[in-house]
Every structure is written in structure tokens, then in C-alpha cells.
């Protein structure tokens, strides 16, 4: 049975679903003010694997991933770029979709935008006001009253005296409590983006946006709510508080959070100017290499980025593709592959242990290489299973020859020379000119190319 670490209880818990095997999953998406970076890649590739795995188990999954298309950062960036917030957010959403498509991240079943949910947001704020969980600040903003929700802080475990400390209103004129946060921000100037509401022209606060979109998609039942660990507090803490205060029957069974990305021993952040954009990384590495690298660390652990580790992921993925070379991997697998499948699913059932799952794929590839020499039918059965299990992780989806040749670091003229030499060597072998055939093999070896002869073809691979 699948067990998931729940950020709320801090325990691994069994995923329990209804008789129809339906699962509702909501993941906080991007704020569309800049290009996506490797932190986005880590989070959304991981939840893409969750989607693929749950569906492979036969669950009827509904996956919703929102887009924040109005926000302080979006407004600031649009003013800096001298473009409308709509133009900026649409441009960044388009770039996100290009990046995610390149990384083979499956699109969600629904991708709601904040600006499409303003009426629902206003309705939910009104409910919070009527229930005395919110108040109108002296500047006209609508604030959530943290002290009205006794369980505040339980999700993130970030308790502090300051959360319940009444403060001097002259210092924080919009708040009764320093932890209170905005549900609705009233327009303060002509450049302020806003919508009409019972409280005047304004726009929603960040946290109420997700509460609204969650409830619109799933009502009161969410099985999995995910996002990066940087969202745990205050965003997810505040989101949960609002949602429960709107309706006490609201529940989220499992909270899941991906770990931080560390670059040069520092947390990756825009303030430190050390972000690595996905689009830049995709110009240097195949998308499957990036996926392999990001899945090589357990999703809850910090991921330490360095190019050496990316290169190592490239070598390991090439090993998997090399084992698929020269076999019929579309053949149906039989009993001999059951042990690998069992081990793979056991790893994934243990809180999505993708590093262990990848190691099982590498073990399977060694078995394929062994049977290539003694039993081609068994090799094909194993290769079929490798391809199938790899697809759950979003890898091994390409033609092996295409992948291996396109990830060999040289230009087309050198690849052409390699293929030409292999052709000349094949001609020499057909007329039993072994001296010439061996000379060409040595010439290719000097280029860093190793040949692999099979009964029906000759393949090459790089020593890089």
C-alpha cells in the first residue's frame, strides 16, 4: 500500500481513498511574473511523477494546478517592464507551458487562474466577515483575524509568541495582530489593479486565492495538497486557516512539500541572484537528463545543484538507453520481470522513493545486457518492463538511438564521419577484410567511440 509523508502530522500515512478510487489533488502553481527556475522544475516534475504513478495504480485522479496571474510581484514587474499586468502574466504563462512541455510535464486536468475566480473570492471573504473571522482595517483592507482560529500554526509548527501578541496599532495600522493577513487590498492609487467589491475597488490577497480555487474545484474534500516547502508558512498555513473558517467540514488528508534547491551552499532565491532558469538548463541538457537528476534526490530532502551531478545523471541515463539498444522493447513482459516490478512499486509506495526506484531501473538494465548475449527473448521482455517503469518517472520515452546520438557532445559533421566509418567497416566485414575493419574500429576508438556489434547491426556509443 502507498504511504505518504504528511507534513501536517509529520508521519508517513497510508493513502486511503473511496470505493471509486477517486483522488483529488491540488498543487500550488506559479506566480506568473518571471521565467520558471529549477525550483519550479523540481516541484512540478515530482508532482508529475505522483500523477503518473497514481494513474498507473488505477486511481481516478483529478489534478488541479492553479496559476496566480495577479499579485504584487506581477504588478511591480509589469510597471518595471512598462507593460500591462495581463500582457506580462500571459507571456510568462506561455513560457511556463513551453518549459513544462519540454520537460514532459503532463498538463493538469484543470489550471484555474486567480482573475477567473474573483467573484468566488469575494463571496468567501464575505463569509469570513459574517463569521467574525475577518475585519475591516482602518485603511479599508479586509484582514483575516488569526486569533479567531485556535488551531493556527498546527500545519507549519511555527509557533511564536508574536502570533498572538496584540500590537500597537500606530505601528501596524492595518492589523489587530501582527500575524493577521490581507484578504482584500483596496485600491490606493490610479495604477492599482482592482475589481469592484462590497468594500470598494481592490484585489484579493495571495492566500485567499488558493482557498477559493481549491473549494471551487473540490468543495470540501482534497486528498493531496502539494507545493514547495517554502509555501508551508505562511501560505499554506493561512490557506488552511481560511478554508476551515469558511466551512468547518473542509479537510485535506495529506499535505506534501518538496525540499529546497541549494546552489553553492545557499538556498536558491531571486534575492541572492542565484536562480537557474529552466530554459537555460534545457539548452545544455536533454529534458530526461534534467528529470533524472531532479528525481535522484528524495523529494523532501534539499537538492544540491551542481553540474557534476547533472553530468553523472547523464551517464546513468545513457546506461539505461544503451540497454534498450538492439532489443524489441515492445514485446510483452513475462514472469521473469515480476521481481523488478515488485521492487520498483515497493520503492514508490514508500513515500515516492524515486532515488531507490532509479537504482532498480539501473539494476534491470544490467540484467538486460546480460541476457542480450544468451537469450534475446528474455532481454526483450526485460527491456519492455524497463521502458514501462521508466515511463512512470517520465523517462525512457525516446528512441534509444535518437537519445544516444543527440546527447553525444559533438557537431553533425563528426556524427556523419562516425556513421560513414561504421558503414565502411561493415563493408570490410562483409568481404572478410578484418585488417581494415579493425583499423576503422581503432580509428573510431581514438575519437572516443566504442562499437557494439550485434547479429543484425552495429551500434556506437561515446566514452564521454
Curated annotation (Swiss-Prot):
So which cofactors does this thing need?
Answer: Zn(2+)
Give the principal location in a single coarse category. cytoplasm
User: What broad class of enzyme is this?
Assistant: ligase
The EC number(s) this enzyme carries: 6.1.1.16
Q: Which CDD domains match?
A: Anticodon_Ia_Cys (cd07963), CysRS_core (cd00672)
Motif 'KMSKS' region is found at: 267-271
Q: Which InterPro entries does the UniProt entry name for this protein?
A: Cys-tRNA-ligase, Cys-tRNA-synt_Ia_DALR, Cys-tRNA/MSH_ligase, CysS_C, Rossmann-like_a/b/a_fold, tRNA-synt_1_cat_dom, tRNAsynth_Ia_anticodon-bd
Q: Which UniProt keywords are given for this protein, alphabetically ordered?
A: Aminoacyl-tRNA synthetase, ATP-binding, Cytoplasm, Ligase, Metal-binding, Nucleotide-binding, Protein biosynthesis, Zinc
Q: Where is this motif: 'HIGH' region?
A: 30-40
Please share the entry's free-text remark on the cofactor.
Binds 1 zinc ion per subunit.
What GO molecular functions are on record for this protein? ATP binding; cysteine-tRNA ligase activity; zinc ion binding
Q: Which residues bind ATP?
A: 270
Q: Name one Pfam family in it.
A: CysS_C
Q: Where found?
A: Cytoplasm
Q: What is the official name of this protein in its record?
A: Cysteine--tRNA ligase
Question: Which organism is this protein's natural source?
Answer: Buchnera aphidicola subsp. Baizongia pistaciae (strain Bp)
Amino acid at each position: 500500500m502507498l504511504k505518504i509523508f504528511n507534513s501536517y502530522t509529520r508521519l508517513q500515512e497510508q493513502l486511503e481513498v473511496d470505493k471509486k478510487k477517486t483522488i483529488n489533488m491540488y498543487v500550488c502553481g506559479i506566480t506568473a511574473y518571471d521565467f520558471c527556475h529549477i525550483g519550479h522544475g523540481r516541484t512540478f516534475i515530482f508532482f508529475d511523477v505522483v500523477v503518473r504513478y497514481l494513474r498507473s495504480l488505477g486511481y481516478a485522479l483529478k489534478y488541479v494546478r492553479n496559476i496566480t496571474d495577479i499579485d504584487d510581484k506581477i504588478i511591480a514587474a509589469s510597471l518595471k517592464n512598462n507593460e500591462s499586468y495581463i500582457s506580462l502574466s500571459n507571456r510568462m504563462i506561455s513560457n511556463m507551458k513551453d518549459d513544462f512541455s519540454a520537460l514532459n510535464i503532463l498538463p493538469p486536468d484543470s489550471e484555474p487562474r486567480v482573475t477567473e475566480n474573483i467573484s468566488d473570492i469575494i463571496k468567501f471573504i464575505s463569509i469570513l466577515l459574517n463569521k467574525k473571522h475577518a475585519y475591516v482595517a482602518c485603511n479599508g483592507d479586509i484582514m483575516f483575524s488569526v486569533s479567531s482560529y485556535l488551531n493556527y500554526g498546527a500545519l507549519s509548527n511555527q509557533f511564536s509568541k508574536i502570533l498572538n501578541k496584540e500590537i500597537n496599532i500606530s505601528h501596524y495600522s492595518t492589523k489587530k495582530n501582527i500575524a493577521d493577513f490581507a484578504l482584500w487590498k483596496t485600491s490606493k492609487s490610479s495604477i492599482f489593479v482592482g475589481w469592484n467589491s462590497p468594500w470598494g475597488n481592490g484585489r484579493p490577497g495571495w492566500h485567499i486565492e488558493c482557498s477559493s480555487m481549491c473549494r471551487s474545484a473540490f468543495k470540501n474534500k482534497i486528498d493531496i495538497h502539494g507545493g514547495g516547502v517554502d509555501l508551508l508558512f505562511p501560505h499554506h498555513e493561512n490557506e488552511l486557516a481560511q478554508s476551515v473558517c469558511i466551512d468547518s467540514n473542509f479537510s485535506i488528508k495529506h499535505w506534501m512539500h518538496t525540499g529546497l534547491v541549494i546552489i553553492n551552499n545557499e538556498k536558491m532565491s531571486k534575492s541572492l541572484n542565484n536562480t537557474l532558469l529552466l530554459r537555460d538548463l534545457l539548452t545544455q541538457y536533454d529534458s530526461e537528463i534534467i528529470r533524472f537528476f531532479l528525481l535522484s534526490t528524495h523529494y523532501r530532502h534539499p537538492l544540491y545543484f551542481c553540474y557534476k551531478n547533472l553530468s553523472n545523471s547523464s551517464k546513468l541515463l545513457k546506461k539505461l538507453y544503451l540497454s534498450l539498444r538492439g532489443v524489441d522493447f515492445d514485446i510483452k513482459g513475462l514472469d521473469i520481470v515480476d521481481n523488478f516490478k515488485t521492487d520498483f512499486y515497493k520503492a514508490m509506495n514508500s513515500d515516492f522513493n524515486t532515488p531507490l526506484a532509479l537504482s532498480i531501473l539501473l539494476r534491470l538494465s544490467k540484467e538486460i545486457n546480460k541476457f542480450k548475449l544468451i537469450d534475446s527473448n528474455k532481454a526483450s521482455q526485460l527491456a519492455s518492463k524497463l521502458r514501462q517503469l521508466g515511463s512512470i518517472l517520465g523517462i525512457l520515452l525516446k528512441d534509444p538511438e535518437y537519445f544516444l546520438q543527440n546527447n553525444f557532445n559533438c557537431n553533425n559533421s563528426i556524427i556523419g564521419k562516425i556513421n560513414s566509418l561504421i558503414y565502411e567497416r561493415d563493408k570490410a566485414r562483409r568481404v572478410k577484410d578484418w585488417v581494415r575493419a579493425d583499423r576503422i574500429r581503432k580509428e573510431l576508438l581514438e575519437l572516443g567511440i566504442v562499437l557494439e556489434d550485434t547479429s543484425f547491426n552495429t551500434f556506437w556509443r561515446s566514452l564521454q
